[in-house]
Curated annotation (Swiss-Prot):
One of its GO terms (biological process) is oligopeptide export from mitochondrion. This is ABC multidrug transporter MDR2. InterPro entries: AAA+_ATPase, ABC1_TM_dom, ABC1_TM_sf, ABC_transporter-like_ATP-bd, ABC_transporter-like_CS, P-loop_NTPase, Type_1_exporter. Induction: Expression is induced upon exposure to amphotericin B, the allylamine terbinafine, and the azole itraconazole. The lineage of its organism: Eukaryota, Fungi, Dikarya, Ascomycota, Pezizomycotina. ATP binds at residues 438-445, 1170-1177. Residues 403-682, 1135-1374 form the ABC transporter domain. It comes from Trichophyton equinum (strain ATCC MYA-4606 / CBS 127.97). It comes from the Eukaryota. Belongs to the ABC transporter superfamily. ABCB family. Multidrug resistance exporter (TC 3.A.1.201) subfamily. Gene3D superfamilies: ABC transporter type 1, transmembrane domain, P-loop containing nucleotide triphosphate hydrolases. Its main location: membrane. Residues 738-758 are annotated as: Disordered.
């Protein structure tokens, strides 16, 4: 049952369908509802309607309506005063003409009084303009802030509602791109710039109204060009949207590479894969560059045409006006005065100028509409399986119902051509244990997904009792099932919250009253207090009885899952944060937490997909015994590769290639001597000399387990020892093994890094210059054309002043006509010159920006991939935040070589040219007006400071919300399985509250200075006319001089006002540049080559950070380069650990290795076994030099790697991690990543490695074969298939040392046998070290090291350890199918 959100941050309520509806929606007027429906139509495709659909198609509430209406009215009001100024100025021109042409000496006092009156009127207009501008910029800024918050929440909620098939086909990096890039574009296009644009349109319309009232003939002529403006705007918007879509596709693919690389830095380092990943990343960026250039050229043509039409139309107005004034001078009948013509030309010239300044805004609005459409596509999508819906039967109980699959066929949407299930039919009896076994990729996990209704069958059906699964409410169904997945996924919350997630949708009536607390902030606040030092009991008491009940249930579930002791051993206990996807916990710990999450809801149906695969055999046996007790009256479905965990099932279903081969009990299937019996023979661990002894031992162990289940703990003696020493469960520790979890684990980074001095502006500029330097010619061309554009305004002022002077009736008609023709022609020539300059400017800066963006992104990724793991796991350095460095920050920095810097330089050129010309023409007027410039600049600088502080303060705030969204999509199966949509949504909304409130305060503060910067120019108008008229009346200057100086300076001040609209972009670029310079300034080993004396050995490369940057990177996927491989050594490595002590930096009081000493001879196959947390995986971390030991030596081939700089020794080491990682790219690319850094794997070598890993046939059967694209993490492949791909990636390296961390845990017995045979082939030239809990995989090892408590307690062959090592023998017994 969905729960209503009483106080949603968006002012919305969640209906029983899970759809957000504004709380005020029902009271909205009918016209508004119809407007929303109109602009929500999917067939409304023009950019204009797309923009209105963005504003009105997201269910705005009353507040939003009020803000839009008030902001629009204020924007219209802000545009009206300026045409009124034109009327006043026209009357003033008539007065000045009358005084200069009069044959009698008129007293100056009359003219001075009229001027003073008009100046006061200008001041009143200025104040009105400031008020209107502040209102509309404030309102529209709030509209934009509220809109993007609604879009964030709606987009996130829509993602949560979608069926898993949708997220399976979602491009990797798409969510990050939508919530970072698209949201930023939308906010830029729906904030204060909208009010400014409305004001400009209002100005434009009002100007034409005034023009028609004054001189209708000229106004009508100029009115004909208005449709051209709209044609250019919409035509350009269409192409800009087209190219933006293409760019977005390429950038999303590139972002996926960044995201997956930064999320799996251990693999990147282990295989030195950074160069190959960088090349693939660059390849996607190059694909985007041509479309970006086309977009820039389209924009510059659109912008240039606006200038051309504006200036050409003014040329027409000058010419036609001169003819009318000439008629008046010749005494012909005419109602036109010089002032009236001046008013028309002045207001239309200024209106055209200001409208042309809005061209960049139109580009921003078009981009915002395009981004909004991309988001709305997902927001409006109807989910095929909606886990938040109230539809379906919510009364059926699964406790006593039979579950049946009837002739089910199924294909995954990501690979529709590959059949997964083919006519599968079987029954799952109630309250019985059904086990499903079979080869990897046979469809076992798919069956679980169908039972959870994460997918629907293509044909056939799944039934519960006599009801089709589709008839049952999805939330109710999933609430009745406890699921433990093959790869357990946890959310970035505390252990307490993760286990309590199992209660959120529990079908048990006794848990219903807990739901409001589970969805609220109580548990988060509780764990935060505990982490801050409060005792658990005190914090729980403060939160109340419901929270205490949840904590007690959590502890009980943790006890059942054998997790309570390791939780208690953690410093923060249940309050310990698990990190992104549980990265702060080991695999075994995550699996136990996931098991507790399933058991806490006391479900009638339990689905276990390899639920104990990551555990050592003793822990597995303990948990299995516990499961047997709690599942006595539970329908249990388990998937297992370890047949020892399935042999006691009431029914075993054997699957192969998507079909059911046979089913029955263990004894029946063994007797049948079919597929299952063959699997049993493959998995049994050898024969023992004394079977009776083994049976006796087995009986004793079972008795010990039964006794342990009656006590408070389920841990065995070895695990207690490990936990008392604080050793992490790092057998399956990708987080600790390959990534440390705390910020204080930074040996390469000083503790006071957070207090390091802020980059000065000069340091930032100096550090950014190497990024810009290669494009200096393009930038120079852009700067030259920017100066031309800026100076053209001064040229316009010169033409304008002479034109106004030539229209005086004191001159004869022929002279007026010839002057009008001349200056009209000059204006037309100016239009052509400016058109060409704008196009060249846009193309030059656009190309320079794209090349700088490419260079910055590639170098940023290069630097990130070269950082040590400790750096990546420092406080606040999540993959999501680091992705922003490569995407958002690089994009912001590139704007400094694009349109932003172009506008800035043209404005500065305009300012200097206007000031210089004014001083040359009429310095007395200019020097007074120039005194106002510092006031204008000061208002802009103050706003710059406000926006810079705002940007820096909240840079991480919304990144947290983005990280929550990305994490939720990455773990969408867990969220769907446990119906955590509402919980995730609540956490997401809470993360938005703080930045939203602070943003609103910044809006009110920052827009004050923006409004002042815009409005102050009208005060300059007032001062200019007052002082200029005094100078004319005093005979110091002529009208021509005045009307040159006036527009020259006023255009300059107006340009400054426009420049301050770019302050947010400049502020972002400043912060982004500082971030990127900081990143690129980090030194790496190998940046400089030194000889033995410490001096530089070579001065050839002045700064290696900027070397080897290919402008046209090779196609790393399509071209498998055949190279002559170097002569690799033909024998394995020798490895020695001598008295090694090690503690993880984040837990300095807890030893991980305690005087470990082992010796592995070259070419040996050795194994590390022992209980979870004994230090096995830590040895791999030290062998890969992810860490350095506190003391002792690690010697590889006679070289102590702890005393050597660099990590070149990794070139001949290959790692198969427990959690198998795939990157965005083809299968061939993923396998080729394993090749040594100086060699590209050929297709033949890749196929050979795949054959050895028993995955070649599977790949070859795919429609695209080795060119099949892997999504991020390879989710279209099964767990076993991914594991075999990882093995192939390791084998293609031809390693001398092969490290296998549970490398066959997800494999069926047949695949496991193939892999074991392959390893036997390569073992002749390779040293193999394996960590394993499945002892049948290592019982033939040359030497087995028994690791307990961080030290080696015994070593020998399998037979030797069975005879003399009690703990090893116990493990053998637990895994024996004969026991």
């Amino acid at each position: 049952m969905a729960v209503e959100e009483k106080n949603s941050p968006t002012g919305a309520a969640m209906t029983n369908t899970g759809i957000l509806v504004p709380s005020s929606q029902q009271s909205l007027p009918e016209w508004w509802t119809k407007t929303q429906k109109f602009f929500s139509r999917e067939n409304t495709i023009t950019p204009t309607f797309g923009y209105f659909r963005l504003l009105f198609g997201t269910q705005p509430g009353k507040t939003d309506i009020a803000l839009i209406v008030i902001g629009t009215i204020a924007g219209i009001g802000a545009g009206i005063p300026f045409p009124l100024l034109g009327i006043l100025f026209g009357e003033l021109v008539d007065d000045l003409n009358s005084s200069t042409c009069s044959t009698t000496q008129a007293p100056p006092g009359g003219y001075q009084a009229a001027i003073t009156t008009k100046v006061l009127q200008v001041i009143y207009v200025s104040i009105l303009n400031f008020v209107c501008m502040y209102i509309h910029t404030g309102c529209w800024s709030m509209v934009g802030e509220r809109l993007v918050r609604r879009l964030r929440t709606k987009y996130f909620h829509s993602l949560l509602r979608q069926e898993i098939a949708f997220t399976d086909t979602l491009p990797s990096g798409d969510v990050t791109s939508r919530l970072v890039s698209d949201i930023e574009v939308i906010q830029a296009g729906t904030s204060e710039k909208v009010g400014l644009f409305i004001g400009t349109i209002s100005y434009f319309v009002a100007a034409y109204i005034v023009a028609f009232l004054k001189v209708a003939t000229i106004a009508a002529m100029l009115m004909s060009v208005v449709p051209i403006y709209f044609l250019m705007a919409f035509g350009g918007g269409h192409y800009i949207k087209k190219y933006s879509g293409r760019i977005s596709t390429h950038i999303n693919a590139a972002t996926s590479i960044v995201s997956s690389s930064l999320s799996h830095m251990s693999i990147v380092h282990a295989f030195n894969a950074n160069a190959r990943l960088e090349a693939l990343f660059a390849q996607h960026l190059v694909s985007a560059r041509m479309d970006a250039l086309k977009k820039a050229i389209t924009h510059s043509i659109q912008f240039g045409m606006l200038y051309f039409v504006a200036y050409a139309s003014n040329a027409l107005a000058f010419w036609q006006g001169s003819r009318m004034i000439a008629d008046l001078a010749e005494g012909k009948p005419s109602k036109v005065s010089v002032g009236a013509v001046y008013t028309v030309i002045f207001v239309l010239l200024d209106a055209s100028f200001v409208l042309s300044q809005m061209a960049p805004f139109m580009h921003i609005f078009a981009s915002a509409a395009s981004a909004g459409d991309r988001l709305m596509t997902t927001i409006k999508r109807q989910s095929a399986i909606d886990g938040t819906s109230s539809e379906g039967d919510s009364t059926i109980s699964l406790a006593s119902e039979e579950i049946e699959l009837q002739d089910v066929t199924f294909n995954y949407p990501a690979r529709p051509e590959v059949p997964v299930l083919q006519g599968v039919s079987f029954k799952i009896p109630p309250n019985k244990h059904t086990a499903i076994v079979g080869t990897s990729g046979s469809g076992k996990s798919t069956v679980v997904a169908l039972l959870e209704r994460l997918y629907d069958p293509i044909t056939g059906c799944v039934r519960v009792g006599n009801r089709d699964l589709k008839e049952i409410n999805v939330r109710h169904l999933r609430g009745s099932i406890g699921l433990v997945q093959q790869e357990p996924n946890l959310l970035d919350r505390s252990i307490l919250e993760n286990i309590a997630h199992g209660l959120v949708s529990s079908s048990q009536e006794k848990h219903k009253h807990l739901l409001p607390t589970l969805l609220g902030p109580s548990l988060s606040e509780l764990t935060e207090k505990i982490r801050q030092g409060a005792s658990e009991d005190e914090a729980v008491t403060e939160q109340g009885d419901v929270v205490r009940e949840i904590v007690n249930l959590t502890r009980h579930a943790a006890t059942l899952s054998n997790a309570i002791d390791f939780i208690n051993a953690l410093p923060d206990g249940l309050a310990t944060r698990v990190g992104s996807s549980g990265a702060e916990l080991s695999g075994g710990q995550k699996q136990r937490i996931a098991l507790a999450r399933a058991l806490i809801r006391d479900p009638p149906v339990l689905l276990l997909d390899e639920a104990t695969a990551a555990l050592d055999s003793t822990s597995e046996r303990l948990i299995q015994a516990a499961l047997n007790k709690v599942s006595e009256n539970v329908t249990t479905v388990s998937i297992a590769h370890r047949l020892a965990t399935a042999k006691d099932a009431d029914n075993i279903i054997v699957m192969q290639k998507g079909r059911v081969m046979e089913q029955g009990t263990h004894m029946d299937l063994v007797a049948r001597d079919g597929v299952y019996a063959g699997m049993v023979r493959l998995q049994n661990i050898g024969k023992f000399s004394s079977s009776s002894s083994i049976m006796t031992e087995s009986t004793q162990v079972d008795a010990n387990i039964d006794r342990s289940l009656t006590t408070d703990t389920l841990l065995n003696k070895e695990e207690k020892l490990s936990l008392e020493q604080g050793v992490l469960d790092e057998k399956e520790k990708p987080a600790q093994l390959y990534m440390p979890e705390e910020a204080d684990s930074l040996p390469t980074e000083p503790e006071n890094e957070k207090e390091k001095p802020k980059q000065t502006l000069w340091a930032t500029m100096k550090g950014s210059f190497p990024l810009i330097r290669p494009n200096i010619l393009l930038i120079s061309l852009g700067l030259i054309t920017s100066i031309m554009i800026g100076v053209s305004y001064t040229g316009e002022a010169v033409i304008f002043g002479h034109t106004v002077g030539s229209l005086s009736v004191c001159r004869g008609g022929p002279s007026i006509r010839s002057s009008g023709m001349l200056f009209g022609l000059l204006f037309f020539i100016l239009a052509i010159v400016k058109f060409a300059a704008v196009i060249v400017n846009g193309a030059a800066f656009g190309w320079a920006a794209e090349k700088t963006l490419y260079r910055t992104r590639v170098l940023s990724l290069r630097s990130l991939l070269r950082q040590p793991l400790e750096w990546h796991n420092a406080d606040g350095r999540t993959p999501g935040l680091l992705v922003a460095l490569v995407t958002s920050d690089a994009s912001a920095l590139s704007s400094l070589t694009g349109t932003t810097i172009g506008v800035l330089f043209s404005t500065v050129a305009n300012l200097f040219a206007g000031v210089i010309l004014s001083h040359v023409i009429a310095w007395r007027i200019a020097v007074v007006l120039l005194a106002t410039l510092p006031v204008l600049l000061a208002s802009g600088v103050l706003r710059l400071r406000v926006m810079a502080q705002y940007q820096k303060k909240h840079q991480k705030a919304y990144a947290k919300a983005t990280a929550i969204t990305v994490e939720s999509v990455d773990n969408i199966k867990s969220i769907a399985a446990f119906s955590l949509e509402q919980e995730a949504y609540s956490v997401f909304n809470r993360s938005l509250k703080a930045p939203y409130k602070s943003n609103m305060k910044s809006v009110l503060h920052g827009n004050f200075w923006l409004s002042l910067a815009y409005s102050i120019s009208t005060l300059v108008y007032a001062l200019a006319y007052w002082w200029g008229s005094q100078q004319i009346l005093a005979g110091m200057y002529t009208q021509v001089q005045f009307f040159i100086v006036l527009p020259a300076l006023l255009f300059s001040t107006q340009s400054c006002g426009q420049m301050f609209a770019l302050v947010p972009d400049i502020s972002k670029a400043r912060i982004a540049a500082s971030n990127i310079v900081d990143l690129l300034s980090i030194k790496h080993e190998g940046d400089e080559e030194y000889d033995k004396t410490g001096s530089k050995a070579s001065a050839k490369h002045t700064d290696p950070r900027f070397n080897m940057l290919e402008d046209k990177p090779r196609d790393v996927e399509a071209q498998l380069i055949t190279t002559t491989p170097p002569s690799f050594p033909t024998k394995g490595m020798g490895v020695q650990f001598r008295n090694v002590h090690f503690r993880y930096p984040s837990r300095p009081n807890q030893p991980a290795l305690d005087d470990l000493s082992i010796n592995i001879s070259p070419g040996q196959f050795c194994a590390l076994v022992g209980p979870s947390g004994s230090g096995k995986s830590t040895t791999f971390a030290l062998l890969e030099k992810f860490y350095n030991p506190a003391s002792g030596s690690i010697i590889i081939d006679g070289v102590d790697i702890t005393k050597q700089s660099g990590a070149a020794f990794r070139d001949t080491i290959a790692l198969v991690p427990q959690e198998n990682v795939m990157f965005e790219g083809t299968v061939a690319f993923n396998i080729g990543l394993g090749a040594r850094p100086d060699v590209e794997a050929t297709q033949e070598e890749i196929e050979e490695a795949c054959r050895l890993a028993n995955i070649h046939d599977t790949i070859a059967a795919l429609p695209d074969g080795y060119n099949t694209v892997c999504s991020q993490d390879g989710k279209q492949f099964s767990g076993g298939q991914r594991q075999r791909l990882s093995i192939a990636r390791a084998l293609v390296r031809k390693p001398r040392l092969l490290l296998l961390d549970e490398s066959t845990s997800a494999l069926d017995v047949e695949s496991e046998k193939h892999v074991q045979d392959a390893l036997a082939k390569v073992a002749r030239k390779t040293t193999i070290v394996a960590i394993a809990h499945r002892l049948n995989t290592i019982h033939r090892a040359d030497r087995i090291f028994m690791i307990e408590g961080g030290r080696c307690v015994d070593q020998g062959t399998h037979a030797e350890l069975v005879e003399r090592c009690e703990s090893y023998r116990a493990n053998v017994i637990h895994q024996s199918l004969d026991a």
